C-alpha cells in the first residue's frame, strides 16, 4: 500500500479538530455571550453603539463569540427598517501603529477581505506609506460617513499596536468631534491582559465603555468542548475514555486555551493513526496524548531556539540544570552565578548580567521559560522556571549542544525524570 490513501482507522473528519471549524454553538461561554449581547443591544434600538473591549488569553472564544453574535445581530437588524448596520473587521496582526491600523481599515472598506466586513467602495485602496497620519484619518472618516448608518469597527488582536493608541481614542469620538451622521462603535479584542492596563486614561474612558473578560477555560469546560468535537471527528470507540480528560487537563494546567487542547488531541490522533497503519491498532490512548504533548513542547523549544545565540542556549541550559535539582523557580542573580560556571565549562566567556537578563526575557516571551514575580522583605524580584517539560527542553538542547546525560541522571536522582 502506498503512502497516500484514504484508509483511516481512527479519524473520521479531521477538519472538526481545526481552529477554524465553527460548531453550531459556542460551548462554555453562555455568561460571556449574554454580557456581550447586552453591550451590543443599543444597535437594534437604533442608538449610538457602545464601545466594547474584550480581553483574555488566546484560544478562549473571543473572536468566535464576536463572529457568532455579530452575524446574529446583522440578521436581526435586517428586520428593522430604521437600522442600517454595517460591520468592518480587521485583524491587527502586523499593525504596530495607529497609522497602519487606519490605512488597513480604509483598504478593508475599499477591498473587504474579512468574513464580517459588509461594506464595499469603488474608491482605490491606499498605499501603506507616504501620507501624514491626519490625511489617513480623514480618508477613513470620509469613507465611514459615506457608508452611513450604524458601523461597528472590529479590531481583533488590537494589542499589536502597543502604546501607539491614537486610533483607539480618535475613532470612537469621530461622530461627536467631526459632526458625522454615521454612528460608529468600536469592538477591540486583545490577547494581552496588560494591554488594557497600559492604555492611556483618555483611551480607557472612550474604548472601555463595556469590558468583557473571557477567562481561561478550566479542565471541565475544555473536556466538554473537546468531547463535542470528538463525537464528530472520530469513529466510534476510537478514543480510550481518558484521552479527552487528559488533553483537557494538560491544556488547563498551561493556558486554558481550547485551541491548545484541540491541537493536542489532533496530534495524539495523528500519532495513533500512523501506528494503526503499521500494526492495526485502532485507538487513541493516553500514551499517545503524552507523546503528543512531548512532541509539541519539544517543537516549541526548537522554534524558540532558532532565535537564540549560543549564549542564549547556555542560559536555557543553566535553567535546565537548576530544574533537574529542583532549584526552580530561581532568582536572576543565582541563575547568573550558575550560568557563569556553565559557560566556562563549555570553553566560552560569560556575558554581563544585563545581557543574561535579556536572554531570560526572550525565553519567557517564546513560552520556554515562565517569569514568576516574587517578593520578600527587601522588595520585588524576578524568578524563572521552565514553562515546558525538562525532557522536551533537553531534547532540543541536545541537537545543538550534544549529549546531556549528566543532567538527565541528576533529574532522575531527584525524581524529576523517570
Language-model features, listed with the residues they occupy:
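A short, basic N-terminal segment
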Residues: 1-50
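Conserved catalytic segments around the Walker B and adjacent sensor/switch elements
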Residues: 53, 76-94
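C-terminal helical "lid" subdomain and adjoining coupling/linker elements of P-loop NTPases
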Residues: 234-237, 246-311, 326-328, 346-352, ...
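Terminal-proximal interaction/regulatory segments of ATP-powered molecular machines
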Residues: 329-418
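Short, hydrophobic-biased segments on the C-terminal half of alpha helices
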Residues: 70, 168, 357-361
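Mid-core helix/loop region of P-loop NTP-binding domains shared across ATPases and GTPases
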Residues: 4-7, 94-102, 111-170, 175-209, ...
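Hydrophobic residues on short alpha-helical segments
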Residues: 312-320, 336, 357
